[in-house]
Structures are given as C-alpha cells and as structure tokens.
Amino acid sequence: MAGQDAGCGRGGDDYSEDEGDSSVSRAAVEVFGKLKDLNCPFLEGLYITEPKTIQELLCSPSEYRLEILEWMCTRVWPSLQDRFSSLKGVPTEVKIQEMTKLGHELMLCAPDDQELLKGCACAQKQLHFMDQLLDTIRSLTIGCSSCSSLMEHFEDTREKNEALLGELFSSPHLQMLLNPECDPWPLDMQPLLNKQSDDWQWASASAKSEEEEKLAELARQLQESAAKLHALRTEYFAQHEQGAAAGAADISTLDQKLRLVTSDFHQLILAFLQVYDDELGECCQRPGPDLHPCGPIIQATHQNLTSYSQLLQVVMAVADTSAKAVETVKKQQGEQICWGGSSSVMSLATKMNELMEK
C-alpha cells in the first residue's frame, strides 16, 4: 500500500499530471469491467462508458459506492452478510469499520484506513484496493467451481498445501542444498571457519546446559503449581458434595488461593517466555513461529466462560433458596400455631383442611 500512497501525489518526477490521470482512468475502467464480469447486481441496467464517469462512480464518496464495496466484502467472506443484516439501522461508520477489519485481515489496507473505504483517499489507492479485492473474489470463485462449498474449497487447498510441503521437505534436492558435498568456502577460509565452529559449539553447549537447568527449575515450579491447583480443586468439589455451606468467608479464601496460584502460573509463563526470547532464541537456528493473532477468539471465549460462571452462581443461589423454602414449609406443616383471633392451636395442614370443609 505504500507504493500506492506514493503514487497519489501531484507533480511526480516520473509521470506528468495528464499521464497520472490517464492511468487512473484506465484502472477505473478495468475495475468496472471486473465488476461486470462478476455480475455485480448494483451494475445491472447501468450503461456508462466514459472513463471519467466510471472513476467518479468508483472513487467518490456515495451510498451507491458503499453498497458495491459491501457486496464485494460479502463475496469474499459470505458470513459477513449476516453481520451486515444485523447492523441495519445503525450508523454507516459501523459497516465501514467491519469492512476495514476484513481488508486488514486480507492484508489489503491498514487497520485504521477507514478513509479508504469512505472514498476520501486518492483514486489510485482506492482502485488498487478494489482491484485486489476483486482478484480475491475471482480466485475464490475459480477455486470453488469444483467444490460444493467454500469450506470444502479451503479444506482442499489445505490438503494440497500439506502435500506440496511434504514433497518439498522429502525431496533429495532439498537435502543436497542443506548438506552440500562440496564446501563453498575457499581453502584459506577453512581454518577460520573451523575455529569459529568450535567456539560456537562450546558456547552453545555451555549455554544449552544453563538453559536446561533453568527449564528444569521452571518445569518443577510449574508442576508444583499444578499440584496445588489440583489440590484446591479437589478440596472445592469435596466441600460441594458434602453440601456444607462454607459461607462467604470460605468462598473468598478459596477465590484468593485460586487467584494466587493463577498469578504464580502467569509469572512462570512470563519468566519462561523471557528466558526463551533472551537466551534460548540465540541458540535456535530456525526462525520463530509465525503466530496468527487470535485475540477476538480468546476474548469471545473469555466472555462465554464469564457468562457461564455467572449463570452457575445464579443456579446455586436459586437451589439454596429453594431448599430453605422447602425446609421452612416442612417446619410450619408440623408446628402448632394460633390462627386469627381463635384461641385454638393447630398445624398448617389441619387449618387448611378445616377451611376446605367450610
């Protein structure tokens, strides 16, 4: 996207203003043609051929342009249609945020590049974004032509990628590249390389032994924390089965213990990550893993677990209240009570029978 931003300025060294406008007009016509090829429903009955008019349609802020972008986003990610349907009546900014989020996940724009979706960015940048989005739709359409659903297409692509990687890593050519028979270094460099290799192996061995000791200590502390957590869990369920209401103080103490163990576990994980980043990472000869950000999934899982915990607390409170109510009713049924102004003493059940006979 940086290249597109650089091409949006006026008075460049390589192209004149007229040539820039001409290239933008051609790009607009190409994007318009791709939209027609994909049977965009918002272009039905629309007959325009003038490049300037097409550019104004695709690059000027309007509700019509926003509907075309919404259609393109739903073609890339069909489940987004349900999200848009639930957002009817809300400000347009919310839909723009959703489309910007999708564009960022597809690595087509920045996470805060909402001006691009609104149509306030330069025309060349907007057309480049639309062109890449349309290419994504076309690739999905071609890939899904032999599959009955989008998920089957993704599954088929994953299997093909795994087969390709397996073939690549099992190929003899890869092993020859990793372990060449002929040393590429000249002879006068060999003694220096051997010395550096010996020094590195010695330093690596000593560092590895230290890291193994640290890892063993961290593993031991982690096992102790896990044992404490298991003991607390067993204690909690034992108290729950006995039906002994420990009271708010006991629950608070148990909660504090769980928080303390969780905090210790968190500190151990942070220490392990610090050791790995600072010292273990230097000994590894492979790049670090490419982790995909799953923040929204973790946040949604945390919210679901919180709601489930609150629901369990409500159920426990209702169960305790119901048990107390039943116990109170049982006591009153067998207890002799004076009813009204009468001096006679009788139980609740006897009084009810007397009223029914009347």
Curated annotation (Swiss-Prot):
Residues 203-236 form a coiled coil. The modification Phosphoserine is found at S16. Residues 1-10 have a biased composition (Gly residues). GO terms for cellular component: centrosome; ciliary basal body; cytosol; HAUS complex; mitotic spindle microtubule; nucleolus; plasma membrane. GO terms for molecular function: microtubule minus-end binding; thioesterase binding. It is found in: Cytoplasm, Cytoskeleton, Microtubule organizing center, Centrosome; Cytoplasm, Cytoskeleton, Spindle. InterPro entries: Haus7-like. Keywords: Cell cycle, Cell division, Coiled coil, Cytoplasm, Cytoskeleton, Microtubule, Mitosis, Phosphoprotein. Residues 1-20 are annotated as: Disordered. One of its GO terms (biological process) is cell division. The keyword Coiled coil applies. Detected in spleen, thymus, testis, ovary, small intestine and colon, with highest levels of expression in testis and ovary. The keyword Cell division applies. Belongs to the HAUS7 family. Component of the HAUS augmin-like complex. The complex interacts with the gamma-tubulin ring complex and this interaction is required for spindle assembly. Interacts with UCHL5. Interacts with EML3 (phosphorylated at 'Thr-881'). Contributes to mitotic spindle assembly, maintenance of centrosome integrity and completion of cytokinesis as part of the HAUS augmin-like complex. This is HAUS augmin-like complex subunit 7.
